[in-house]
Amino acid sequence: MSLTLENLSYGVDGVDYVRNANLTFQAGSFNVLLGRTLSGKTSMMRLMAGLDKPNEGRLIFNGQDVTGLSVQARNVSMIYQQFINYPGITVYENIASPLRLAKMAESEIDRRVKETAAMLQISPLLKRYPLALSGGQQQRTAMARALVKDATLVLFDEPLVNLDYKLREELRAELRDLFRERQCIAVYATTEANEALALGGTTTLLHEGGVIQNGPVMDVYRAPVNTLAAQLFSEPPMNMIRGRVTDTEVAFDEYSHHALTQELSKLTPGDYWFGVRPSHIALAPANDDDLEMSMEVALSEISGSETFIHIDNSHFEMVMQLMGVHQYHTGAPVKVYLPINKLFVFDSAEKLVHTPSRKSGGAV
């Protein structure tokens, strides 16, 4: 069983929401659509569900063209970021509602509702009403209603965004495990790179309605095809700094030079973009060949147990991500260290030409 998007495009009033998308989703797979707000994630899922019709292209399900099929004729479920439950009926009846619409036998309804409730750990809540539930319990109820009908295609439109961090982690792990056992196609939209990594499976990077890259999550993360993909799949976005490679060294500015390592010596002389993840910039060298840079603090932000420090000099700006709480005043000078063995390299056209080698300890 598979769903293929073939040259799919969709737009309204001259605004393109999906541009020439070509993707295939397989049964038993968990697929993540990762992109910023307005990148086309929701529009793409609405096309898959049959809620909107494409301007161009086709949707192929199991070899059959289903582009014009109504949403009612498709076996699809969609879960939104809002907790959409019917407040006037119990959790049991909320979950049972799509089965009653399908005129299923009462005994089968009861079996499916109780089985799905147990799977999502809400069995004790079946007699309660949605407004008496916590946010996490309400979202579990909405998920149960979507899953109880055994849809062949299950779409998640940022379903955990309104939950607190701990609940999100918990439900994320449950979803990942749940779909390992189900022979349906799951598609999950998110704006967060860390969520895509946690969910695993296949990741599709979207930008302004277009597919930038698609593949197994760690392949996309470790080998982004260009600078845009690298920045989309990094939280905060990967830092990009301009550098020039000569026969003997790489220079980032008049003060920051580094002798070519064995790996970087394979680059032909010229101008490149060098990418470094914010979490890989350090306040002390981890290796003898780490590149030292003199910077100035532009902004320091503490978020939970992490500190994000925006730093710059006359040539470039970067963000560094540090574990723990660190206090830095705006304008304070700071020396930072970039691990040469963890640099991504992109050519002047911003295409990937070098990834950090796992053999050299640069796996990212």
Where are these regions (language model features)?
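Helix-to-loop junction immediately C-terminal to a conserved catalytic motif
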Residues: 49
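The feature captures the beta-strand-to-loop junction immediately N-terminal to the Walker
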Residues: 34-36
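Conserved hydrophobic segment flanking the Walker A/P-loop of ABC-type ATPase nucleotide-binding domains
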Residues: 25-27, 338
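Conserved coupling/switch loops of ABC nucleotide-binding domains, chiefly the family-specific signature
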Residues: 53-58, 208
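ABC ATPase nucleotide-binding domains
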Residues: 74-77, 81, 85-226
